[in-house]
Amino acid sequence: MKTAHEIRPGNVIMLDGSPWVVQKTETTRSGRNAAIVKLKLKNLLLNSGTETTFKGEDKLEDIVLDRLDCTYSYFADPMYVFMDAEYNQYDVEAENLGDAAAYIVDGMEETCQVTFYDGKAISVEMPTTIVREVIYTEPSARGDTSGKVMKPATITGGGTVSVADFVKVGDKIEIDTRTGEFKKRV
C-alpha cells in the first residue's frame, strides 16, 4: 500500500477491482488543507481513461504486473499474437492495443513489452522510438518554408503521422511512440 502522494507515473494501482496504470500525477497544496493528488489513469482491462482525485494521505493498493519482452508474430482477427524468446505465444485483443496497433507491421524487428494480469496478456507497450517507411504523403508545397511546416503522412501499418515538409514517399522516419510525433528522417 502506498499513499496517493507516493504514487508516480508508470505505477499500477488496483481501483474498483481493476488494474489502472498511472499516466500523470499532479499534487496541489493549499495553506490550510491537506495536499490533493490528481491522477490521470488508464484501465488496463478496458483500455479506457479517467481522472480522479485523492487526499495525499489516502492509501492505494500498488500492484506489480508481469512484463515480458516479445516480438510480433502475426494477426489472427481479432487477436495479435506475440512470441517470447522461448517461442511461447501470447494473444492480445486488438482493442487492448490502443495506439500501438498503428505501429505494428509484419516482419517488424522491434521488441515489445507484453503486460500480464492474472496470467492473461492484457496490453502491449511499443519501444520508445521506431522506424517506419512513409507509404503516402502529399508533395511539398513550393515556397512554403516559413517556420516549421508539417504535413500528414501514412506509414507502413496504416498509422498517420505529421511529418516535416521535406519528407517524401519511400523515406524512412523515426517516430516517438509515446506521443506519435515525427522525430527525424533516417
UniProtKB/Swiss-Prot annotation:
SUPFAM superfamilies the UniProt entry points to: Nucleic acid-binding proteins (SSF50249), Translation proteins SH3-like domain (SSF50104)
Pfam families: EFP (PF01132), EFP_N (PF08207), Elong-fact-P_C (PF09285)
Keywords, ordered alphabetically: Cytoplasm, Elongation factor, Protein biosynthesis
Biological processes annotated in GO: peptide biosynthetic process
Subcellular location: Cytoplasm
HAMAP family xrefs: EF_P
PANTHER family given in the database record: ELONGATION FACTOR P (PTHR30053), ELONGATION FACTOR P (EF-P) FAMILY PROTEIN (PTHR30053:SF12)
Family of this protein: Belongs to the elongation factor P family.
UniProt-recorded name of the protein: Elongation factor P
